[in-house]
Amino acid sequence: MNSKINRKRRTDRNQVIYYIQDVETLEYYVGLTALSFKGNVFRTLRRRMQKHMQRALAENKNWGLSRVLRERGAERFIFGVIEVVRGKRPAHARETELINTMQPALNTFGVK
């Protein structure tokens, strides 16, 4: 008997809406990531920040956050939780709402 059961991947995982802020200019970015590391929010966000930095250095994109991470360095930025939302669709909707309301300077995709 096969003990491994194929299950549909959950789509209602907890999602973390977070900010990354430049401590000198106070410009910030709002983003979304799936909660990982068995629910450890700090480790999840620390890993996401590492990914942002890695992508900024490797891909040379002209996106707001990538550009300032390259120019100013990761040491100048702090990150934290705005809120945790259950489910991918509600989280994306909430992130879009927050971006449209808060209008963070480093979000350059113009979410509407």
Model-derived features: positions:
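Short arginine-rich
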Residues: E97-L106
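Charged structural interfaces that engage phosphate-rich ligands
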Residues: E83, I99-N100, V111
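Alpha-helical scaffold elements adjacent to nucleotide-binding pockets in ATP/GTP-utilizing enzyme cores
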Residues: R48, A93-L98
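N-terminal cationic leader/targeting segments used for protein routing and processing
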Residues: S3-R7, K61, T108
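Short, polar/flexible loop-turn hinges at active-site or ligand-entry regions and domain interfaces
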Residues: R86-R89, L106-T108
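BZIP DNA-binding basic region
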Residues: F37-V41, L106-K112
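Conserved short loop/helix modules at catalytic or binding sites
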Residues: A34-G87
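GIY-YIG nuclease catalytic motif and its immediate N-terminal context
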Residues: M1-F42, R89-A93
